[in-house]
């Protein structure tokens, strides 16, 4: 069930953002990636261990750096941050023993992250294609 909810939520969030034009600002998807990267830190608070908090902070930092690159350099880095975080969700329990993580979280988060990454990649490609078409039309 967590996979279905993760996929559905990503479709709703990304679809609504695109439909409403909220994602026209280049900061939108990098900000989503930064938020996604931060959740395990909240679970580390529930765990109560400083070691877990430091481990989660180090992992989050990797994805936050990628998200910042998605804002500063190329939106493809936001795709990498989201998709990479989804892959990390599969292995998180091997990286950190965070007792605060709900049992359904890794599956939910992985489903959301990977779905969002695919959607954002599709949006980037569609917009690039649209820009090329507009340039050809103007050039005629």
Where are these regions (language model features)?
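Membrane-helix boundary connector in multi-pass membrane proteins
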Residues: 72-79, 88-105
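Hydrophobic, membrane-inserted alpha-helices
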Residues: 11-15, 36-41, 58-66
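Short, hydrophobic transmembrane alpha-helix segments
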Residues: 18-26, 45-49
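Cytoplasmic-side transmembrane-helix entry/capping segments in multi-pass membrane proteins
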Residues: 26-35, 54-59, 78-84
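Structural signature of hydrophobic alpha-helical transmembrane segments
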Residues: 1-10, 50-58, 107
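N-terminal signal-anchor/start-transfer transmembrane helix
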Residues: 6-22
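Small-residue-rich segments of transmembrane alpha-helices in multi-pass membrane proteins
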Residues: 34-45, 63, 86-94
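Membrane-water interface at the C-terminal end of transmembrane alpha helices
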Residues: 15-18, 68-76, 111-135
């Amino acid at each position: 069930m967590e996979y279905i909810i993760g996929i559905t939520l990503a479709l709703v969030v990304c679809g609504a953002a695109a439909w409403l034009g909220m994602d026209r600002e280049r900061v939108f998807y990098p900000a989503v990636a930064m938020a996604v990267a931060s959740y395990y830190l909240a679970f580390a608070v529930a765990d109560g261990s400083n070691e877990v908090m430091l481990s989660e902070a180090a992992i989050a930092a990797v994805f936050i750096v990628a998200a910042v690159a998605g804002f500063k350099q190329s939106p493809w880095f936001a795709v990498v941050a989201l998709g990479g975080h989804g892959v990390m969700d599969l292995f998180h329990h091997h990286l950190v023993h965070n007792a605060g993580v709900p049992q359904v979280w890794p599956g939910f988060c992985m489903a959301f992250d990977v779905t969002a990454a695919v959607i954002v990649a599709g949006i980037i490609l569609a917009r690039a294609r649209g820009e090329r078409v507009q340039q050809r039309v103007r050039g005629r």
